[in-house]
Amino acid sequence: MKIRPLHDRVIVKRKEVESKSAGGIVLTGTAAGKSTRGEVLAVGNGRILDNGEIKPLDVKVGDVVIFNDGYGVKAEKIDNEEVLIMSESDILAIVEA
């Protein structure tokens, strides 16, 4: 299934992050907590400004981002994969290689 977000919405797939405890034990899954990093899968056309113009989004498909995993971020299952739908304003940073 193909999904196309509207306006300033962004579709992100959460990246799993491996964590280690203070004792060096590798934590995975729920013990490691949810990652707030992900890869952008799709972006909307942009935010509609008060004057009616459309401002393109700063993020693009393929960007790795750090996001705020709170109110307003919606999890959905698409083709048996969980993706997150959020506004661009929920994205805090783009991770540059």
From Swiss-Prot:
One of its GO terms (molecular function) is unfolded protein binding. Keywords: Chaperone, Cytoplasm. It is found in: Cytoplasm. SMART domains: Cpn10 (SM00883). One of its GO terms (cellular component) is cytoplasm. Gene3D superfamilies: GroES chaperonin (2.30.33.40). The keyword Signal does not apply. One of its GO terms (biological process) is chaperone cofactor-dependent protein refolding. It comes from the Bacteria. It holds the Pfam family Cpn10. Together with the chaperonin GroEL, plays an essential role in assisting protein folding. The GroEL-GroES system forms a nano-cage that allows encapsulation of the non-native substrate proteins and provides a physical environment optimized to promote and accelerate protein folding. GroES binds to the apical surface of the GroEL ring, thereby capping the opening of the GroEL channel. Heptamer of 7 subunits arranged in a ring. Interacts with the chaperonin GroEL. Belongs to the GroES chaperonin family. This is Co-chaperonin GroES. It comes from Yersinia pestis.
